[in-house]
Amino acid sequence: MATEFTGVWGRDSITLETGKWAKQAHGSVVYKTGNLVLLATVCAAEEPKEGQDFFPLTCEYTEKAYSVGRFPGGYFKREAKPAEHEVLLSRILDRPIRPMFPEGYFSEVQLLVQVLSADKQVSVQGHAINAASAALSVSSIPFAGPIAGARIGRIGGEFILNPTNEEITKSDLDLVVAGTKDAIVMIEGEASEISKEDMMAALRFAQEQLKFAVAMQEELAKKHGTVKKEVVLKAPDKDLHAKIREFAFDRLTLANKNADKAKRNDDIKAINKETVEHFKTLLAPEDKTKDIKHFLHELEYEVVRELVLGEGIRFDGRKTDEIRQISCEIDVLPGPHGSAVFTRGQTQSLGVMTLGTTSDNQRYETLEGSKEKNFMLHYNFPAFSVGEVRRNSGPGRREIGHGNLAERAIKKVLPTQTEFPYVIRLVSEILESNGSSSMASVCSGTLALMAGGVPISGAVSGIAMGLFSDEKGRFAVLSDIAGIEDHFGDMDFKLAGTKKGITAFQMDLKVNGLGLEVLQKAIEQAEVGRDHILGEMNKAISSVKGNLSENAPRITQKQIPKDRIGELIGPGGKMIRAIIEQSGSEISVDDSGKVTIASPSEESKEKAIAMIDGIFEEIEVGKIYDGVIKRIADFGAFVEILPGKEGLCHISKLDVKRVQSVRDIVSEGDKIKVKVISVDKMGKIDLSRKDVLLDN
């Protein structure tokens, strides 16, 4: 039976429909606002696969080219590999939805959100989260939702719910929040160095807006008559669990106090192996290896959390707000345009910068049309960084997401194209990882930019905050979490910013929601940590010369009249190609007449500028020019005195004495000095070498 709910959320009219399209899916919702139409579908396997011990959730967001009346690009003219922005939005769907499933639920779930009709002014992020949650809410799949998502902007100090794409370009905040009626589940976004107070105000505003979107979904599910499937989880063997606890708890506690990741992992593996062997022998012939390993993992979870919540001790002996040891090196590579290594504990990032020209802009397609980026940050996470062996198959969702977060953190401090007309590419090579590698990428990227002479408005540092909490109400917010604290913790909250304020943030949870008071403590504690990290970075920055690398191109920009662009390009591009070939510089011109010159050396730059200036220079009668013989005729020689401007030096004016043959005096390609005698109404230039010789 078809069910529909319509309501007004902020400035938007929202319609949710179910039971009309995609009825064989376990849950499906058509979500409409403006011209935007989303189809969200979800299906779940009846039972988990044999031996399954994790939750296999897949969330995918896809945009159909037909949604804006366009053909897909490429030879086959059909949608193929997801674009980077689709991958990023898929991650935004996954992160708030994953913690809302019951613990121990291991059936495979596939959630798809497709854009069937696009509205170029509607930002889709929050609506996509709502559509996904609504599909789960009307299904029988166990789900502790609904949750809602909203995008928040701020213009002129006023917060805006679901700003249009045009409004986002004017906003100093781009925040995507997901949550329940009374708790936050996920945060992601960027800002123009906002204060922690403004950040909290934005979260409070967002929390209020989410309530109505949650209520809409609840009303739809109620109308639809949704009945949730009861999940029957395997009852644990309490007796075996108690025996394993008695056998391994104290030893695991001691092993988890080792700050060295490799040594700690080796010790824990040895304890686990010994425990498994001991109980396999004890329980033979019954094989309970999987149960033993599961209980050991639960035991380590308990150990790590009790150390923090009960004793106030982190595995490496740090206080809850203490940052690991930091070291910074700059100019570590001679070839690149800028480089630095940032090390924090056992996490290390090599940041490498390359400067390019407008021809290096990244061009990409979205439903809003073609776009270009002049700054990009690419994050690489090789297997060796964590001492593993695996196939290198290129960047996955995690690499794309981490790179995007670091890129958003840094881009707010970059100079404008007018101030610094370069395209910038940063690469973060993770050399070793033990937590918070994306924030290490922010730090190494900032150092590489400054080492390479990019005039950024301020240094950016990043930190990852964690949380341990329990049912007794105890909680501890941890600064600069290591890998084990991320793995066993409840929160991974990354914040980046300058001394002035926050530039980027991302929060994931493993619990189904946090109150604003916990988030406020994390944001305040993060600011102290970021300031400490900036202090360590500044020690290295103080030695930076601030000059462009000798290997970097020299870029100059000139403005020429719009109506004379054709003169620079020349017929069939002849003129601009000649300047490029002769000067060795790369040259481009846009529709406004802005000319960009990228040169490998100062000499190349000066030559290109002189040739361009020459095109627009007015010929002066009586002035002596350095010319090049272009053609020879019986009656004289044609001499180029400025780019694209030739005059005739008649045979009678080639020398002070009588000339029998032009070739007796000059040949093609010869350089000679000539004086301009006259320029007629048709622009024909009369030249004389004879007058120059007589003057001398």
Swiss-Prot record:
One GO CC term, this protein: cytosol
Reported cofactor(s): Mg(2+)
GO molecular function (one): RNA binding
Keywords assigned: Cytoplasm, Magnesium, Metal-binding, Nucleotidyltransferase, RNA-binding, Transferase
InterPro entries: ExoRNase_PH_dom1, ExoRNase_PH_dom2, ExoRNase_PH_dom2_sf, KH_dom, KH_dom_type_1, KH_dom_type_1_sf, NA-bd_OB-fold, PNPase
EC top class, as a word: transferase
Keyword Transcription: no
Matching HAMAP family: PNPase (MF_01595)
UniProt xrefs under PANTHER family: POLYRIBONUCLEOTIDE NUCLEOTIDYLTRANSFERASE, POLYRIBONUCLEOTIDE NUCLEOTIDYLTRANSFERASE 1, MITOCHONDRIAL
Protein name: Polyribonucleotide nucleotidyltransferase
